[in-house]
């Protein structure tokens, strides 16, 4: 399958360079990943803290502390506790549908600003919570903020970056997610030691810090030339394109942006257009890539890491420290992707990371099966625990340089402008839907499948690696405005792409 995405036509190379202005703008915009990552990391740690459990989820606390014969696999199985974690993702799913319209009508910048502000309110509510209802309302507001940010930020990064650097700059978003996870794990480790049992308030309330960074940063950001053009601001778009490319010679790129913008204006309903045959490759990728990303099992490892480590026999402090270790691995492994994605391409990282995750999951399942069996009762030695953590780190590192960043990068770069906001909304909806679904059923699956849960996720990774090998073309170095070419040259997708796209461009030319 070496020619799965290759073609003979060379991509365009627009004049311009990587400017300091673009790098800073992308770095600030990527702070949207901090709020998502912080929440992923903070939730699992807080739900493993005894004062938090005894106050809000006493039945779980009783199973953990008082019922000595509870199966290790099942002691955290609680619907209210699961709802606390997963309600954010359901809210993000719904919010992303509205965020699509806001992104298209008001621009990427305003969507990020709104997301940061709403997340800030949710953080304050969670930190001050006195009952479960207040916790859930706060989580819903956090989810709305996350939905807005992950709708707008990947689009913003893809549109600001020059084609040859798009992979690296877009992956900064995933890097910020990993930084958020790491800091959340570190904060949980130290707040768990606070005397008086109120450390969980600090953990939840400090989510306001990344929210403030994103809110203030969004105020200072420029909007993208693509977004300005789609809203009829031609002069501003031309000026911004000159600034971000660092050259006066923007004619070819600007002309292509105008053509894409006119094609957008010819589309009355981008949602209906997305369902047309010529956009079948983009629709399939916008559904399957985020879905398969969640079926790696990564989020259950990251936001349930302390709970998971407690389940397999680690003590409370040890489980939080193990989560810090996986957070460090997650962050540093993301740098591998930043350094290699524009050199080796997307497919190589997808396939290599997939194979590594498959190996790690099946070995983890075997290790836990040997030690715990189905009874879920065993004392784990320090040496055995270290081996388990090592293979979890092997899994996390593979995800961090493959499906983690590429699950956001590839969908954000393959959509033509006329369907970009709608298609990105589909990406967010399916990502959040399956994040919600997996979060909602994970503790139940752990209780029912036991060590078999790792084999389940390993099987999913086998399927997704095969999917990439056969159906995903290489997108490295292709300008967004030319991305249709790779589908037209693909052995399978070429049957869907061709004349339809030409008709859209002809419609655009008649409107000029």
UniProtKB/Swiss-Prot annotation:
PANTHER family per the UniProt record, alphabetical: SOLUTE CARRIER FAMILY 2, FACILITATED GLUCOSE TRANSPORTER, SUGAR TRANSPORT PROTEIN MST8
Cellular compartment(s): Membrane
Induction behaviour: Induced by cold and abscisic acid (ABA).
Gene3D superfamilies the UniProt entry points to: MFS general substrate transporter like domains
Name the record gives this protein: Sugar transport protein MST7
Chain ranges passing through the membrane: 18-38, 82-102, 117-137, 140-160, 167-187, 202-222, 295-315, 321-341, 348-368, 386-406, 426-446, 451-471
Entry GO terms, CC: membrane
Cytoplasmic side: 1-17, 103-116, 161-166, 223-294, 342-347, 407-425, 472-512
One of the record's GO molecular function terms: monosaccharide transmembrane transporter activity
Residue spans, topological domain Extracellular: 39-81, 138-139, 188-201, 316-320, 369-385, 447-450
Family affiliation: Belongs to the major facilitator superfamily. Sugar transporter (TC 2.A.1.1) family.
Major localization class: membrane
Species of origin: Oryza sativa subsp. japonica (Rice)
Assigned keywords, A-Z: Membrane, Sugar transport, Symport, Transmembrane, Transmembrane helix, Transport
Entry keyword annotation includes Transcription regulation: no
Protein task: Mediates active uptake of hexoses by sugar:proton symport.
Topology versus the membrane: Multi-pass membrane protein
Xref: PROSITE patterns: MFS, SUGAR_TRANSPORT_1, SUGAR_TRANSPORT_2
Top-rank lineage group of the source organism: Eukaryota
């Amino acid at each position: 399958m070496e020619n799965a995405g290759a073609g003979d036509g060379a991509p365009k190379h627009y004049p311009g360079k990587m400017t300091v202005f673009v790098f800073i703008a992308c770095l600030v915009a990527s702070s949207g990943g901090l709020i998502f990552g912080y929440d992923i990391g903070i939730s699992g740690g807080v739900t493993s803290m005894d004062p938090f459990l005894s106050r809000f989820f006493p039945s779980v606390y009783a199973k953990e502390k008082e019922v000595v014969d509870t199966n290790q696999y099942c002691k955290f199985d609680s619907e209210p506790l699961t709802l606390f974690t997963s309600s954010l993702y359901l809210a993000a799913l719904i919010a992303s549908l509205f965020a699509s319209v806001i992104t298209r009508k008001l621009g990427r910048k305003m969507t990020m600003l709104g997301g940061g502000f709403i997340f800030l309110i949710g953080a304050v509510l969670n930190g001050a919570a006195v009952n479960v209802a207040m916790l859930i309302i706060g989580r819903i507001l956090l989810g709305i903020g996350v939905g807005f940010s992950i709708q707008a930020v990947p689009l913003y990064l893809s549109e600001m970056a020059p084609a040859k650097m798009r992979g690296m700059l877009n992956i900064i978003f995933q890097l910020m997610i990993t930084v958020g996870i790491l800091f959340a794990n570190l904060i949980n480790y130290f707040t768990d030691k606070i005397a008086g049992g109120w450390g969980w308030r600090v953990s939840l309330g400090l989510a306001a810090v990344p929210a403030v960074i994103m809110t203030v940063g969004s105020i200072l950001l420029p909007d993208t030339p693509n977004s300005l053009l789609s809203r009829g601001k031609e002069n501003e778009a031309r000026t911004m394109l000159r600034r971000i490319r660092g050259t006066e010679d923007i004619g070819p790129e600007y002309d292509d942006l105008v053509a894409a913008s006119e094609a957008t204006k010819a589309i009355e309903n981008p949602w209906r257009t997305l369902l047309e045959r010529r956009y079948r490759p983009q629709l399939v990728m916008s559904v399957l890539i985020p879905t398969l990303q969640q079926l790696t099992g990564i989020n259950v490892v990251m936001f349930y890491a302390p709970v998971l480590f407690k389940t397999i026999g680690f003590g409370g402090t040890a489980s939080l420290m193990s989560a810090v270790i996986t957070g460090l691995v997650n962050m540093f492994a993301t740098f591998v992707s930043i350094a290699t994605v524009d050199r080796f391409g997307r497919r190589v990282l997808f396939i290599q990371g997939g194979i590594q995750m498959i190996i790690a999951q099946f070995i983890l399942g075997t290790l836990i099966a040997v030690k715990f069996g189905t009874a879920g009762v065993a004392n784990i030695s320090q040496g055995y625990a270290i081996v388990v953590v090592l293979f979890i780190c092997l899994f996390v590192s593979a995800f961090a340089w493959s499906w983690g960043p590429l699950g956001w990068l590839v969908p954000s770069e393959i959509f033509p402008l006329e369907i970009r906001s709608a298609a990105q909304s589909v990406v967010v909806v399916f990502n959040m839907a399956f994040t919600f679904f997996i979060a909602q059923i994970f503790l139940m699956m752990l209780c029912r499948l036991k060590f078999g849960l790792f084999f389940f996720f390993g099987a999913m990774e086998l399927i997704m690696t095969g999917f990439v090998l056969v159906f995903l073309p290489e997108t490295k170095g292709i300008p967004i405005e030319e991305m249709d070419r790779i589908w037209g040259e693909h052995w399978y997708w070429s049957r869907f792409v061709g004349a339809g796209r030409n008709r859209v461009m002809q419609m655009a030319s008649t409107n000029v």
